[in-house]
Amino acid sequence: MSVGIIDAVEWQTVVDFKTGGKSDAESEKIDIARRILENHHYPGDLDLEGIDWTVKMALELDKEYKPELMFVMFGTPFFHSVYRQTPEDRWKTIVDYVFDRTKYFLDVTEYEPIIIGLGDMVDIKGYIELNNLDGLYLANNWSYRCSGILEHVEKDLDKIEKMEGISTTISKADFIDRYKPKPEFAERLPDYLLSADEGYQFKGYGSSARKAYKIPALNEHIPVYTKLGEVKDITDIRKVMDKALQHKKVAVIIIEGVGLKDFRYPYEPCNNRVDWYTYDQSENHYLTISTGKHYYQHEIPPVSRYLRKDFDKIIYPFSGPHHYLPQDTAGRKPEIKSAAVSNRGIFPHVVSGADICIESFARNLYNMGSIAIINDDK
């Protein structure tokens, strides 16, 4: 049974992670997580101490659990790009500090690193307004560059063709014919999937209510540093991981909001695109890194249709749109121990598949503490 430990600074509670109900489960991994959470309280998404918090949590997990695979994920640069008008000197300080703390973590542990910058950010050029369509539409709180049309009417397509900022329109039928996705993925696809030009953000039902100052660029390549093997494509990262884990401890360090322009290590540019779709620092980006499979081989599309069955019986209530925990992620490899830490919330436990994952419990910048997820036994 998967278990969640929620730490709200003054109290902790243990829940059945699948149902959300209170649990009295006990185990060595639960004890480890409870001790670590109790000693390090999450300072908030926009606080630079969140970088230190991430590193301290990772060091504690390394000391107490001794995993062979460690995910360390930093969201701070992303938060400061999207939600703040960050001056250039302040931005440099943030990026320098993330890489300084990364170096410290690697210096005091025995991990061989794979360091990934998920991509540069750009100023918003304009908004693509969907409210004037006659059909139903969906935006995505996690993907600024994708949207979907549900139950469309033909004249919507004429309007879409004339909208500034839309780069691609692909029908559900064409998508399925081209990519042969899983049935679960196909079931959730909208009638039409839309993607935006660089700098354009979709606005509509499901988009973020907070004002964004920057959004992910059209990052056709992202920086990857590692001495463990050649990484030409984003799907190569998992292959390099698997090979190295046969005889080494590996740390996969992921830094959001940092691309080729600001990366502080020597790097090889890694292909970050498949056909018309460019990964944009959403959960699909992480899942592709962790599984070695492109987004259309997962179960949740970039913009997902809501289904009646999702609400008939709600499961994994702390996992956002994910109604399952993938079993093909790197952390689910049966022959290794794995752990993950992130100051991004909701999806790190999903995408890492780690035995123990500690992540921030903040929603839309509102800090409610931190949460540890103890995964099902392998």
What are these regions (language model features)?
Residues 1-378:
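Feature captures the catalytic ectodomains and active-site-proximal regions of enzymes
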